[in-house]
Each structure stands twice: as C-alpha cells, then as structure tokens.
UniProtKB/Swiss-Prot annotation:
Organism of origin: Latimeria chalumnae
Domain Globin positions: 1-142
Keywords: Heme, Iron, Metal-binding, Oxygen transport, Transport
Organism ancestry: Eukaryota, Metazoa, Chordata, Craniata, Vertebrata
Endpoints of the signal sequence: none
Protein name in UniProt: Hemoglobin subunit alpha
Length: 142
C-alpha cells in the first residue's frame, strides 16, 4: 500500500500535474497508441488519434480527472474508481492489461514534464499509486 510519505509525494507532484492535465493525458495516450498499437482497438470510434484530436483531448481530461479523484481519495481508491472499473469491465470490455500499459506511458509523460520534480522517490510513489489504481480498476473484472 501507500505510506504517508508516498501520499505526500503524490499530492505534491499532482498539484503540478493538475495545471497540465490535458497535455499530460494526451501525451500519455498518444504514447500508448504508438508503443502498444493493440490498445487502439478500444478507440475505433475515434477517427483521429493524433495529438490534435479533440476526442483524444476530451478522453485525456476524463482519464486525468479520474486520477485526480483517486489522488483526492488515496485511502479509498477502489471505491472512488468503482464506477469507472465497472464501465471498462462490463460495457467497454477493455482488457485490463491496458491500464498497466497506460500507467507506464503516464509515468514517462510525468518524467518528461517534471524532470526536476520527478525524483526517484516521487517516481516510486507514483508507480505505487498507479499500481493501486490498476488494482482498483481490475476489481470488477472478477
């Protein structure tokens, strides 16, 4: 789980992330599609997956908005993300491995945007946070 120190580091970096959520989200999604093209199958209704795509920008806001909610509820990530998990598991039928892949892409985007602030300690805390998010999203797949 997340330690008190992890939570402090996560909230600190996320204060900076919130000022650039759309750009970071778009960068992470574009990287996901380039590095893991199989993930595009869930976005076949998007005619444009380029960084300028309005639909991609909108989805980036939704994804980062959900992560912001999780940051604001670090002691209860599973309940916080329950509805999102349910939609992805039962309606959209997303292979849950994609959450982990997007997490990796998000970590790269954070490191690129916040090179000075993304210390090894922050990286570890964010990695642990994203693991908790992934576990929460996996919850309704059972």
């Amino acid at each position: 789980g997340l330690t008190a120190a992890d939570k402090t580091l996560i909230k600190s970096i996320w204060g900076k992330v919130e000022k650039e959520t759309e750009a970071i989200g778009v960068e992470a999604l574009v990287r996901l599609f380039k590095c893991f093209p199989q993930s595009k199958v869930y976005f076949d209704h998007f005619t444009d997956l380029s960084p300028s795509s309005q639909k991609l920008h909108a989805h980036a806001k939704v994804v980062l908005g959900a992560l912001t909610k999780a940051v604001n509820h670090l002691d209860n990530i599973t309940d916080t993300l329950h509805d999102i998990s349910l939609v992805h598991a039962k309606k959209l039928l997303v292979d849950p491995v994609n959450f982990e892949l997007l997490g990796h892409c998000l970590e790269v985007a954070l490191a690129a945007h916040f090179a000075t602030d993304f210390t090894p300690e922050v990286h570890l805390a964010i990695d642990k946070f994203l693991y908790e998010v992934e576990k929460a999203l996996f919850e309704t797949y059972r």
